[in-house]
Amino acid sequence: HPYIGFHNPEGSNTGEYDDDCDIDERLWASAELLRTDTTHRDTYLKAFEKYSSMTHPEVSKTDFGWTDVSGMATLCLLTDPGNTCGATRKREYEQILFTEADRLIELQTKSGFELSMQPEDFVWGSNMVVCNRSMLLILASLCSEGDTASRYREAALNQLHYLLGRNALDISYVTGEGEHAFKNPHNRPTACDEIDLPMPGWVSGGPFKTPCDPAAIAAVP
């Protein structure tokens, strides 16, 4: 295809989840195939090495978001008991993982809520960032031992504490969980089921740094 990427087609009026890079998707795919299909391992290893060596601003190897899924490749490789990527690549990915995990712990030391977030991280759907960083810290814990593993695990729990109420609003961002759980998710099935309380277990998108509706713009300086 002459253009690799995604933008909403003409006439679409919904929010755009655009993506101009497919290196992360191909990296993840090659990692999964390398791990699961032994019949074409050389082919998949060659592809994995190719995409591992590529660099792009949107490919971090530590993110589990919708724009950058390259962290899924890291998750796949570092939980592979067969170590099919080879010892050298495994050490490389472990170092990338631990470097980012240590950065996230450093952010918690600067946060009043022990949260691995900076002001610029509160994007649309910021709780996805909170959850994804918790996943990364859990993976770092699983790849470590002793006090180091415990340190990463506690940092992951701090992310969960934030979601369940240890935040500036004193609310749980998970419906049905906690005394002050949020009750009005933007979700059509739970809005039309004729039950006042929302379905339990939905996670709010969370705070957004940029007010974008009239009520928020009027209330926030």
Please state what every model-predicted region is:
Residues P57-T67:
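Zinc-dependent metallopeptidase catalytic helix centered on the HExxH motif
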Residues F113-L115:
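Long, compositionally biased eukaryotic scaffolding/regulatory segments
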Residues N13-M54, D68-S111, E120-P221:
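Aromatic (Trp/Tyr) and acidic
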Residues F6-N8:
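Internal amphipathic alpha-helical repeat/solenoid segments
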